[in-house]
């Protein structure tokens, strides 16, 4: 029997290959952790429905490949995203340095008002840390976006990160609706029973 969802939010996970984007996604969507995931090929997505302020919000979360050869494919998914999480690995300096490049990709391909958040993942491996929390916080401050350190393995801040991003998107949408502003490309999608989309797992494999 079809359920009614009040809103559908499209979220995107981006960042270098190997930073743990897929693990973060599976921790949030399945409350599970698997250290043997292979690198994402193309695009995957998962769906989870949450409740915020008495509204049921269906989150469609897209996990993108970090490898350069998939960049053209993955940037096509930026448009229409309402929230983007930029993920780096706190034990990998290069993945942190590349966050600025990922932000440039967002500026080139995503809607101007997309909500963004930076995640410093693998917080559980503190003994191998190369990027301090303070540097992550400063980078986020430079761009005026939120920051959290997470661990998909130890289940630290993953739930909090997704709920915070969803709450920010909803607040922005509510403000637009209250102001009766013209509908933009990133307006929330209200869902009725006949418009339910499949919540099955999808993988786009490039041969």
Curated annotation (Swiss-Prot):
Positions occupied by motif Switch 1: 31-45
Record lipid sites (S-geranylgeranyl cysteine): 204
Motif mapping: Switch 2: 63-80
Membrane topology label: Lipid-anchor
Lipoprotein found in the keyword field: yes
Residue positions where Cysteine methyl ester is found in the record: 204
PTM sites of type Phosphoserine: 181, 185
UniProt-annotated binding residues for Mg(2+): 22, 40, 63
GO annotations of cellular component type: centriole; centrosome; ciliary basal body; cilium; endosome membrane; Golgi apparatus; lysosome; midbody
Gene Ontology MF term list: GDP binding; GTP binding; GTPase activity; small GTPase binding
Residues the entry annotates as binding GTP: 17-23, 35, 39-40, 66, 121-122, 124, 152-153
Notes on how activity is controlled: Regulated by guanine nucleotide exchange factors (GEFs) such as RAB3IP/Rabin8 and RPGR which promote the exchange of bound GDP for free GTP, GTPase activating proteins (GAPs) which increase the GTP hydrolysis activity, and GDP dissociation inhibitors (GDIs) which inhibit the dissociation of the nucleotide from the GTPase. Activated in response to insulin.
Lipoprotein found in the keyword field: yes
Propiece residue ranges: 205-207
Protein location: Cell membrane; Golgi apparatus; Endosome membrane; Recycling endosome membrane
Protein's GO biological process: autophagy; axonogenesis; cellular response to insulin stimulus; cilium assembly; Golgi organization; protein localization to cilium; protein localization to plasma membrane; protein transport
Cofactors: Mg(2+)
InterPro entries: P-loop_NTPase, Small_GTP-bd, Small_GTPase, Small_GTPase_Rab
CDD domains cross-referenced by the UniProt entry: Rab8_Rab10_Rab13_like
This protein's domain notes: Switch 1, switch 2 and the interswitch regions are characteristic of Rab GTPases and mediate the interactions with Rab downstream effectors. The switch regions undergo conformational changes upon nucleotide binding which drives interaction with specific sets of effector proteins, with most effectors only binding to GTP-bound Rab.
Subunit structure and binding partners: Interacts (GTP-bound form) with MICALL1; regulates RAB8A association with recycling endosomes. Interacts with MICALL2; competes with RAB13 and is involved in E-cadherin endocytic recycling. Interacts (GTP-bound form) with MICAL1, MICALCL, MICAL3, EHBP1 and EHBP1L1; at least in case of MICAL1, MICALCL, MICAL3 and EHBP1L1 two molecules of RAB8A can bind to one molecule of the effector protein; ternary complexes of RAB8A, RAB13 and either MICAL1 or EHBP1L1 are possible. Interacts with EHD1. Interacts with MAP4K2 and SYTL4. Interacts with SGSM1 and SGSM3.
Family: Belongs to the small GTPase superfamily. Rab family.
Function comment: The small GTPases Rab are key regulators of intracellular membrane trafficking, from the formation of transport vesicles to their fusion with membranes. Rabs cycle between an inactive GDP-bound form and an active GTP-bound form that is able to recruit to membranes different sets of downstream effectors directly responsible for vesicle formation, movement, tethering and fusion. RAB8A is involved in polarized vesicular trafficking and neurotransmitter release.
Protein name: Ras-related protein Rab-8A
Encoding gene, per UniProt annotation: RAB8A
């Amino acid at each position: 029997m079809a359920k009614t969802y009040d809103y559908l939010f499209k979220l995107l996970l981006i960042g270098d290959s190997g930073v743990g984007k897929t693990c973060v996604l599976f921790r949030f969507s399945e409350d599970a952790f698997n250290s043997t995931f292979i690198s994402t090929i193309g695009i995957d997505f998962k769906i989870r429905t949450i409740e915020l302020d008495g509204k049921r919000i269906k989150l469609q979360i897209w996990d993108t490949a970090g490898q350069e050869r998939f960049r053209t494919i993955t940037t096509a998914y930026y448009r229409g995203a309402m929230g983007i999480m930029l993920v780096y690995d706190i034990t990998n300096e290069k993945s942190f340095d590349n966050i600025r490049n990922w932000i440039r990709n967002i500026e080139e391909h995503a809607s101007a008002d997309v909500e963004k958040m930076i995640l410093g993942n693998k917080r559980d491996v503190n003994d191998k840390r190369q990027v301090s929390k303070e540097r992550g916080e400063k980078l986020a401050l430079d761009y005026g976006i939120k920051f959290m350190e997470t661990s998909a393995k130890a289940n630290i801040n993953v739930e909090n990160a997704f709920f915070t991003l969803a709450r920010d998107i909803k607040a922005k949408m509510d403000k637009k609706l209250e102001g009766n502003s013209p509908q933009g490309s990133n307006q929330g999608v209200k869902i009725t029973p006949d418009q339910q989309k499949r919540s099955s797992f999808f993988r786009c494999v490039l041969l």
